[in-house]
Amino acid sequence: MRLSVVIVSYQVKDLLHQCLCSVERAIDGINADILVVDNASTDGTVDMMKQWHPSVKLIASQENLGFGKANNLAVSQSDSEHILFLNPDTVLPEDNLTEALAVMDADTDIGSMGCRMIDGTGEFLPESKRGMPTPMIALYRLIGLSKLWPKHASY
């Protein structure tokens, strides 16, 4: 398998459905699978998955494992070359994964990749741009400098 898309879900049935529809379109033509760990949702997520997304590998936990442990569980069941961790409120453009994989293939020094996030109106989400976490950057954020100069290259 070339790519596994890992999604952790808890009480977000409708958002997850939209996310999965976009991921299924984005992986068309890619040797990929989708793994969803549901953290014991009671909102009908498991039934929705079985009805609308039967090809998605569903790991229905009987307890809320938490975000990190649920991601680790999915990764332990993947044998893919690449792993994409995706939040269930994400909608992917159709060509997004093809382009990302091409970049990864072109440069074997790349070990991980982030993305530029935009909201539903097309506006850039600054939380998708993070500087390297250093003590100095933590201090800038703590005392408010990052709010005074939000476009500074340090953060």
Which residues does each predicted region cover?
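Short aromatic/hydrophobic "clamp" motif used to bind/position activated sugar donors
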Residues: 83
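Short, flexible, basic/aromatic active-site loop/helix in glycosyltransferases
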Residues: 132-155
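Short beta-strand/loop segment that forms part of the nucleotide-sugar
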Residues: 31-40, 59-61
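N-proximal low-complexity "stem/linker" segments adjacent to membrane-targeting elements
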Residues: 1-25
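Conserved donor NDP-sugar-binding/catalytic core segment of glycosyltransferases
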Residues: 91-127
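Glycine-rich, basic loop-to-helix element that forms the pyrophosphate-binding segment
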Residues: 60-78
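A conserved acidic beta->alpha catalytic loop
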Residues: 22, 38-46, 63
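Acidic helix N-cap motif at the loop->helix transition within catalytic regions
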Residues: 17, 43-51
